[in-house]
Structures are given as structure tokens and as C-alpha cells.
């Protein structure tokens, strides 16, 4: 990965976290290790409906459009 890719992923994760903060009132623990992202402590089922749509590596870092 080059530096530009890391910046894009960083910005994506920032938007990702802010996006969840708006739709989820419970506290989420997001831990990133390697290429896997583990999210725990969320009781909102909306999280699990949206999560598959937000996988950056499956969609070429494209943000979801509502």
C-alpha cells in the first residue's frame, strides 16, 4: 500500500465512524487489526444491515449513496 491509499482508507474509516455515530445511540467499540475490523457493543440491528454495504475492499472504496 502506498501513502495515498492509506490516506483514502483513513478518510473512509473516519466517515464510517461518524456515519455510525449518527444512526447508533449505543456505544460501539471499533478495533482495527490488520485488514479486519471488529465492531462490538452495538445493540442496534441497523448496524448489521448497513455493514455489508460499507465494506471498502469489496466496492473499491466507494461510499454508500443514500
UniProtKB/Swiss-Prot annotation:
Residues 24-66 are cytoplasmic. Its main location: host cell. It holds the Pfam family TGBp3. Residues 1-2 are lumenal. GO terms for biological process: transport of virus in host, cell to cell. Plays a role in viral cell-to-cell propagation, by facilitating genome transport to neighboring plant cells through plasmosdesmata. May induce the formation of granular vesicles derived from the Endoplasmic reticulum, which align on actin filaments. TGBp1, TGBp2 and TGBp3 seem to act together for cell-to-cell propagation. TGBp1 is the main movement protein that physically cross the plasmodesma with the viral genome. TGBp2 and TGBp3 would facilitate TGBp1 function. This is Movement protein TGBp3. It comes from White clover mosaic virus (strain M) (WCMV).
Amino acid at each position: 500500500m502506498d501513502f495515498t491509499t492509506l490516506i483514502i482508507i483513513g478518510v473512509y474509516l473516519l466517515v464510517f465512524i461518524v456515519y455510525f455515530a449518527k444512526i447508533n445511540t449505543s456505544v460501539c467499540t471499533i478495533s482495527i487489526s490488520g485488514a479486519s475490523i471488529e465492531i462490538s457493543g452495538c445493540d442496534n440491528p441497523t448496524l448489521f444491515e448497513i455493514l455489508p454495504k460499507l465494506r471498502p475492499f469489496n466496492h473499491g472504496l466507494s461510499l454508500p449513496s443514500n
